[in-house]
Amino acid sequence: MKKAAAQLKTYRAKRDFTKTKEPSGARKVLPAEHRRFVIQKHAASHLHWDFRLELNGVFKSWAVAKGPSVDPADKRLAVEVEDHPLDYGDFEGTIPKSEYGGGTVQMWDRGLWAPQGPKTPEDALAAGDFKFVLAGERLKGSWVLVRIKNNRGPTSARFHRRTHLWEWCLRSRRNRADGSRPRRPAA
């Protein structure tokens, strides 16, 4: 778990744990036999949904504008944010407005996920084309995160202007088997 501790350096640097009830990551949470995911509705300065996938002892995390959509035609901006500790998967509460991410965090969905395709999750993320399956309470099925390219050439990708982290597109990969359009989950 030494690697996970190093991955949480940015997360810890942004927070004052004497003021926020967010988990510091000090509590040991063993990796699950099957990888977990959580989606938390986060009413911060801008309402968004925090999308987290367990990988290598941390939650890889993205802030998703408008929340995930089950309609494959809907593409959602997903700004990569710092890795979060695994105990964040149980966090709900209010972060003080004066703190980073100030606002209310509510559990929106949780479950298990598995990678799709021949690449490891690490290689797929590095390549900028990461396919996976979710088995959650609200979201089920095949999804993809694609790193957004900018107009500076085929190998360039966009960074978020504030976080300097990658911008991605999150979308569902398929309609339902009966061909009907999926309905959007209630917010």
Give, region by region, the residue ranges found by the protein language model.
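A charge-rich, low-complexity, intrinsically flexible signal that marks solvent-exposed coils, linkers
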Residues: 1-187
